[in-house]
Swiss-Prot record:
Alphabetical list of Pfam families matching this protein: OTCace, OTCace_N
InterPro entries named among the record's database cross-references: Asp/Orn_carbamoyltranf_P-bd, Asp/Orn_carbamoylTrfase, Asp/Orn_carbamoylTrfase_sf, Asp_carbamoyltransf_Asp/Orn-bd, Orn/put_carbamltrans, OTCase_ArgI
GO biological process, one term: arginine biosynthetic process via ornithine
Superkingdom to which the source organism belongs: Bacteria
Compartments it resides in: Cytoplasm
Pathway per the UniProt entry: Amino-acid biosynthesis; L-arginine biosynthesis; L-arginine from L-ornithine and carbamoyl phosphate: step 1/3
PROSITE patterns per record: CARBAMOYLTRANSFERASE (PS00097)
EC top class, as a word: transferase
Keywords per UniProt: Amino-acid biosynthesis, Arginine biosynthesis, Cytoplasm, Transferase
Name used for this protein in its record: Ornithine carbamoyltransferase
Organism: Yersinia pseudotuberculosis serotype I (strain IP32953)
Gene that encodes it: argI
Amino acid sequence: MNQFYKRHFLRLLDFTPAEIIALLDLATELKKDKKSGCEQQKLVGKNIALIFEKDSTRTRCSFEVAAYDQGARVTYLGPGGSQIGHKESIKDTARVLGRMYDGIQYRGYGQRVVETLAEFAGVPVWNGLTNEFHPTQLLADLLTMREHLPNKSLNKMTLAYLGDTRNNMGNSLLEAAALVGMDLRLVAPKACWPEEAFVISCQALAQKTGGKITLTEDIAEGVNGADFLYTDVWVSMGEPKEVWQERITLLKPYQVNMRVLTLTGNPQVKFLHCLPAFHDDQTTIGKQMAEQYDLPGGMEVTEEVFESAHSIVFDQAENRLHTIKAVMVATMSKI
């Protein structure tokens, strides 16, 4: 019997270390089958609702292509396409959609929303992103890390994350590191560290799995010996402009540039980013940021690093498809 059948995928700590590895193994298998043209459809006849209270490129495309590859059909409910939480409660929306669909993806705001959907839908619910967690991204990250260091197990790898570690990526990295026994360094000013109680709980789990979680303001200490450097955008478009100035000033020293890569002491170090990235001035926002905050070479990462051989961000982006497909197949297929 499939251990994942009809389960939700809301956050990584809902799973055991062995289950996370099993999902990664399934993703590897599905990716291989797709590349070789011998993929077997296990979701034929399934209907999937994709709720997006926040717009997305990678998450939407990954869920849609994964569903189509497996023979399922999707309905996209965008920011203006549903009444969830406005004219209809989350609880009622869950019970309606659960009668019509075999699985529901939610990408939006509070974790409580996706948890309520899961509580009342009666079908598998998957977290495409909330303010608190981004578990599908971390599955893609772990798969990418395994692919680029095939002779090293996850519990022997070291990852340093630079920037604002209080966000959903910081939280999910903490959970992932604790589960797989990784050496995780969160490198950031103290004002940008995650909630202390949550860090302590993840460190306690990491002790059991052989992992190590370190928080430091010292860049050289944090990145020394790292196999992977990771960062994310420093500001979100929905945040007020005054927040931008304060945070960018705070995080400028933590930009991932060639100097930081050199500090790792690892000439083979790889760079990760969940995208989109402000690495140049070729977008409207990127140009505005570069001019307003004196960041001509990029914001959280420089163009030089982003376009270098160290960067594996597009392998990482592709793996969103394969890991999301693994979650869908695992939770909606009996075998």
